């Protein structure tokens, strides 16, 4: 379940424990619907409510991990249904860290990755309610490939007006670029 009222002292999600029948590491919320989508890609979000909102607004290709971080099993499951994944995690620091952890798993599964960073809202659900599906579609079209996204994350760590920080940024960016192809 998910808390509806905003309570900073309560967990946002309360999830069932894993059992022999229900294995969160191997299932994705909404996949039963998303695998039928004609859009040609899947959208991976953090929360059930994000996936539900996306479906309500016409993005019938949205899935969410079931109250757990993305796993290798999830990535493999995604690769059975698509070659392209839009990774759209919450805008907060935890969501962006989770996106960074998800990228290599999705790559190992052979998926092409686009990363969309939500602006002016905390998550896809809130964004859709505030701005609607047309603005969300524009965000999808403007989403970054994983290298652009990671370079932007690195850039955000440094004030490149300072020489020492500019040097640190260039070194870290070069390290990322050296891992490519």
Predicted regions, residues:
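Conserved catalytic cores of soluble enzyme domains
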Residues: 68-120, 127-133
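C-terminal or mid-to-C-terminal helical accessory/interaction module adjacent to the motor/catalytic core
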Residues: 112-181
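Generic hydrophobic alpha-helical scaffold/packing signal
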Residues: 35, 79, 103, 125, ...
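Residues at alpha-helix boundaries and short interhelical turns
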Residues: 38, 89, 93, 180-181
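Phosphate-handling DNA/RNA-contact segment within nucleic-acid enzymes
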Residues: 1-81, 85, 98-99
């Amino acid at each position: 379940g998910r808390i509806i009222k905003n309570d900073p002292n309560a967990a946002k999600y309360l999830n069932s424990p894993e059992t022999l029948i229900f294995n969160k590491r191997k299932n994705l919320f909404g996949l039963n619907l998303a695998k039928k989508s004609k859009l040609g890609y899947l959208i991976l979000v953090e929360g059930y409510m994000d996936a539900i909102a996306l479906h309500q607004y016409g993005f019938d290709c949205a899935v969410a991990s079931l109250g757990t971080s993305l796993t290798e099993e999830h990535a493999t499951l995604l690769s059975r249904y698509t070659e392209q994944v839009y990774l759209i995690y919450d805008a907060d620091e935890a969501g962006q860290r989770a996106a960074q952890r998800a990228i290599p798993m999705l790559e190992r599964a052979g998926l092409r990755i686009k990363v969309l960073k939500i602006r002016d809202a905390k998550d896809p659900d809130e964004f859709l309610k505030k701005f609607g599906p047309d603005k969300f579609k524009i965000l999808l079209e403007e989403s970054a490939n994983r290298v652009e996204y990671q370079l932007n994350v690195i850039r955000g760590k440094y004030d490149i007006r300072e020489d020492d920080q500019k040097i640190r940024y260039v070194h870290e960016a070069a390290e990322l670029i050296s891992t490519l192809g």
